[in-house]
């Protein structure tokens, strides 16, 4: 069965800070970093927000959709260079330093990057969560994406796949699926049955 991973871009604005702090001598750079990351956030989201309309008008396999994906991929590559430079220099900056949107930009760019990059920065994000600097819900999405890329089952059920033959969406395989909602609740995610309604998926939790 041919399938493709749906790039999740539902941003609710509820992401909290992922911050490691920056050197005191760099405090004056906060405004500059905030502006940079605000710009990156906009670039990451604005083309993805066009996907629904382009698909509805032209179809998923249309030239228009392929052109849009080419644009997204080019923007992602540029954003990734900028974000990894920031992360390598300052660590994972929190909303107290770069604002909530700037903080979300860090997550989005890594979430939309390649497997090697995701695996590199996953430990940094884990540490941020342990130190109360990041929301577990953000980490859950990255954990799931990396797990699937490694050929494993996802943990939180955040990743949705699409059957390209039927056009229908479905939940990618989940480890210990019967207890997935407990894990989702532990990181502040809604029950899976509610989450998948965004893709019109009729989902029932398996019996324990």
Where are these regions (language model features)?
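N-terminal helix-rich structural modules
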Residues: 22-150, 157
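A cross-kingdom marker for long, charged
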Residues: 179-208
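Residue-level detector of secondary-structure boundary/capping sites
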Residues: 3, 74, 116, 174-175
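Bacterial Sec-dependent N-terminal signal peptides
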Residues: 1-25
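An amphipathic alpha-helical core segment
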Residues: 126-190
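A C-terminal-region feature
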Residues: 22-32, 158-164, 173, 196, ...
């Amino acid at each position: 069965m041919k399938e493709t991973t749906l790039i999740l871009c539902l941003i609710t604005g509820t992401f909290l800070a992922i911050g490691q702090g920056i050197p005191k001598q760099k405090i004056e750079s906060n405004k500059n970093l905030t502006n940079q990351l605000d710009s990156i956030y906009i670039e990451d989201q604005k083309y993805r927000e066009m996907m629904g309309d382009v698909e509805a008008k032209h179809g998923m396999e249309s030239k228009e959709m392929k052109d849009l994906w080419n644009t997204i991929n080019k923007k992602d590559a540029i954003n990734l260079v900028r974000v990894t430079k920031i992360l390598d220099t300052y660590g994972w900056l929190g909303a107290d330093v770069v604002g909530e949107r700037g903080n979300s930009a860090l997550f989005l760019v890594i979430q939309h990057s390649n497997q090697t990059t995701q695996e590199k920065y996953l430990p940094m994000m884990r540490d941020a969560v342990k130190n109360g600097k990041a929301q577990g819900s953000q980490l859950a999405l990255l954990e799931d994406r990396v797990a699937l890329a490694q050929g494993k089952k996802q943990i939180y059920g955040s990743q949705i796949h699409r059957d390209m033959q039927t056009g229908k969406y479905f939940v990618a395989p989940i480890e210990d699926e019967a207890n997935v909602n407990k894990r989702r609740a532990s990181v502040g995610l809604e029950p899976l049955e509610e989450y998948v309604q965004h893709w019109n998926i009729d989902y029932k939790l398996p019996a324990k």
